[in-house]
Amino acid sequence: MQITEKYLPFGNWQTYCRIVGEATDRAPLLLLHGGPGSSHNYFEVLDQVAEKSGRQVIMYDQLGCGNSSIPDDQAETAYTAQTWVKELENVREQLGLDQIHLLGQSWGGMLALIYLCDYQPKGVKSLILSSTLASAKLWSQELHRLIKYLPKGEQAAIKEAETTGNYDSPAYQAANAHFMDQHAINVTPDLPEPVLRKKKGGNLAYLTGWGPNEYTPIGNLHGYEYTDRLKDLDLPALITSGTDDLCTPLVAKSMYDHLPNARWELFAGCGHMPFVQENAKYQELLSDWLISQD
């Protein structure tokens, strides 16, 4: 399968882009990774969707991580939703992506919703919301509910970190790691190489945009709230999430209930990455969805 790598100019920066497959008459699938700052790496497990669905699959590293520019010295102005939307617009313009299907995973889904609701772009044929959210407040509430299932000592370590603002203690680090093992993905050596691959940068983008962890959104996205605006998005939308996901069933259902033209697929036993944990099933679902929406 043909893999094309490009560096796209974006103002004084550049955006690394990875294109799977050759152009066809079907709209490409454009992937928006999570974080902020997680990089495209894990999306490489979806390369086969290009062949299965007969289209290009395009992924890129957002500003602040991976092979793209990492302007950490300009974090407060560079690592914002506005900049990341401009970068998305630039990727579409530079690659001539007039018609696309758009998939956003975690933060990438937030970026997709901001883009669609605030900028009303043309040419987005369908939306795939993968383990994402429409409300930072609900997300935080749900994750604090899940924290109550941790051992008492771990709950206390997390509470102390949030109270003091000190997230460096070994007790907190261990508690947060346990929480993420349960609800993001348990990192084991048998995971696919792209998922295990060490990403470049991204930590400051995450801290600036979101916060010190998943459940304490104190970055510049802390006020993110799009639930009531979903009713205005009439494009076909596919929501995917796991039963053990950071995107809890309530978070996913809140999006499903407000989107007028949505389907929701819940993956049993999966955390934040059903596309990794149930890769074959996810690829089949995604490929069938894309073909049905062409």
Curated annotation (Swiss-Prot):
The active site is at S106 (nucleophile), D245, H272 (proton donor). SUPFAM superfamilies: alpha/beta-Hydrolases. Gene3D superfamilies: alpha/beta hydrolase. It comes from the Bacteria. Residues 28-278 form the AB hydrolase-1 domain. NCBIfam families: pro_imino_pep_2, ProImpepLactob. Belongs to the peptidase S33 family. This is Proline iminopeptidase. The lineage of its organism: Bacteria, Bacillati, Bacillota, Bacilli, Lactobacillales.
